[in-house]
């Protein structure tokens, strides 16, 4: 009798994706983040669904409904904080996943990589709209500042902003549509994730050496299901410690004050995972220039296959580019710190220097380092 998982039209797809999938025998824990992101997405959709049952997307009651969830709904406080901190865990996994892709040259799988960049934009858009929903001070002013950036687009900017707002300011219409988009986008993201996996399984996974691993494959189950399970346990432990012991550590105290259009907070800043991009935006005095730099700071990932000059795929055996890579990581941490600081000396100049360094490393220094390493190889 043939095994059902190999013959059933639906189970067969799952089998080829998660059970009998040929995987390289040497992939490290850096390859765990794909499954962890899937877990984060599932947690966010599930907790979000329960929050949506009690939330009201009206400016008069939104803040109160979130308070009601935390105080009156059974385990509402847990669901709310799981959802808020789940977003942070999602972005930690995302950044590590992208960082792994850059380090090991996974961007050479162009379709998979570009789908990943689209996913990153979609997740960032979803998180931004979600942050607006509690209708606290930072929700309101964050929405006002970020949507206002679109007014920098020549000719159609102002019309576009008013169209997104549904009026002449961020108000009831804006909140309602943001809730609608925030609800539907995770399901679109789930569909895009399936396309991301489809493209990945066309080529097979990369590995730490960057070499072809067709001659040395092992089945995904049980080897990598067990390995992923360890990652899941570590993530869930960190997640529950964060949620149960330090639920507000990554949030902004200003968001516990109801939105007030007449009172601007002293420092308007987004959630921690957007601070690096926010720092790049603020480092350019020109509005349109800042918006373009902001978009390019993420879109530059899509250019990485074009900027690859090395004969080797991964950075495993490339010490010069490795140095550039870790300087880039440090630079992103500096940008994250600067994004949360006020716009004054010396933070302005540090932010501008870090922004220039960010683009210079990716667009100039890493490609040059790749060419130098090629020449060193040719000398042998």
From Swiss-Prot:
GO terms for molecular function: metal ion binding; ubiquinol-cytochrome-c reductase activity. Heme b b566 binds at residues 97, 196. It holds the Pfam family Cytochrome_B. It comes from Microtus lusitanicus. Heme b b562 binds at residues 83, 182. Binds 2 heme b groups non-covalently. It comes from the Eukaryota. Belongs to the cytochrome b family. The keyword Heme applies. This is Cytochrome b. The chain crosses the membrane at residues 33-53, 77-98, 113-133, 178-198, 226-246, 288-308, 320-340, 347-367. GO terms for cellular component: mitochondrial inner membrane; respiratory chain complex III. The lineage of its organism: Eukaryota, Metazoa, Chordata, Craniata, Vertebrata. Heme 1 (or BL or b562) is low-potential and absorbs at about 562 nm, and heme 2 (or BH or b566) is high-potential and absorbs at about 566 nm. The cytochrome bc1 complex contains 11 subunits: 3 respiratory subunits (MT-CYB, CYC1 and UQCRFS1), 2 core proteins (UQCRC1 and UQCRC2) and 6 low-molecular weight proteins (UQCRH/QCR6, UQCRB/QCR7, UQCRQ/QCR8, UQCR10/QCR9, UQCR11/QCR10 and a cleavage product of UQCRFS1). This cytochrome bc1 complex then forms a dimer. Disulfide bonds: none annotated. It is a multi-pass membrane protein. InterPro entries: Cyt_b/b6_C, Cyt_b/b6_C_sf, Cyt_b/b6_N, Cytb/b6-like_sf, Cytochrome_b, Cytochrome_b_C_euk/bac, Cytochrome_b_N_euk/bac, Di-haem_cyt_TM. Component of the ubiquinol-cytochrome c reductase complex (complex III or cytochrome b-c1 complex) that is part of the mitochondrial respiratory chain. The b-c1 complex mediates electron transfer from ubiquinol to cytochrome c. Contributes to the generation of a proton gradient across the mitochondrial membrane that is then used for ATP synthesis. PROSITE patterns: CYTB_CTER, CYTB_NTER. CDD domains: cytochrome_b_C, Cytochrome_b_N. Its cofactor is heme b.
């Amino acid at each position: 009798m043939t095994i059902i998982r190999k013959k059933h039209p639906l189970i067969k797809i799952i089998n080829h994706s998660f059970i009998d999938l040929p995987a390289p025998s040497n992939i490290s824990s850096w390859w765990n983040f794909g499954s962890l992101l899937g877990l984060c997405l599932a947690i966010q959709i599930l907790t979000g669904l329960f929050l949506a049952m009690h939330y009201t997307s009206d400016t008069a009651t939104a803040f109160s409904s979130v308070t009601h969830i935390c105080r009156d709904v059974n385990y509402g406080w847990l669901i709310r904080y799981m959802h808020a901190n789940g977003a942070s865990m999602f972005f930690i996994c995302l950044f590590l996943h992208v960082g792994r892709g850059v380090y090991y040259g996974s961007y050479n799988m162009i379709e998979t990589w570009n789908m990943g960049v689209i996913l990153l934009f979609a997740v960032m858009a979803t998180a931004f709209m979600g942050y607006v929903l509690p209708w606290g001070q930072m929700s309101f002013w964050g929405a006002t500042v970020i949507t206002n950036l679109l007014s920098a687009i020549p000719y159609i900017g102002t019309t576009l902003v008013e169209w997104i707002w549904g009026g002449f300011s961020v108000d009831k219409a804006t909140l309602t549509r943001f809730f609608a988009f925030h609800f539907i986008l995770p399901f679109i993201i789930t569909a895009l994730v399936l396309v991301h996996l489809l493209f990945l399984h066309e080529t097979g996974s990369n590995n730490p050496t960057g070499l072809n691993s067709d001659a040395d494959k092992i089945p995904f189950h049980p080897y990598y299901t067990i390995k992923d399970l360890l990652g899941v346990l570590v993530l869930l432990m960190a997640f529950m410690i964060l949620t149960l012991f330090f639920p507000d550590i990554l949030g902004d105290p200003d968001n516990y004050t109801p939105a007030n259009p007449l009172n601007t907070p002293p420092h308007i800043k987004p959630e921690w995972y957007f601070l690096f991009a926010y720092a790049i935006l603020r480092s350019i005095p020109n509005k349109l220039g800042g918006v373009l730099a902001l978009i390019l700071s993420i879109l530059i990932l899509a250019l990485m296959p074009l900027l690859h000059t090395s004969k080797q795929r991964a950075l495993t055996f490339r010490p010069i580019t490795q140095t550039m890579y870790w300087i880039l990581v440090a630079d992103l941490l500096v940008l994250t710190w600067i994004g949360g600081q006020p716009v004054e000396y010396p933070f302005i100049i540090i932010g501008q220097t870090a922004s220039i360094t960010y683009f210079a490393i990716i667009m100039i220094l890493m490609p040059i380092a790749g060419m130098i390493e090629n020449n060193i190889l040719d000398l042998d």
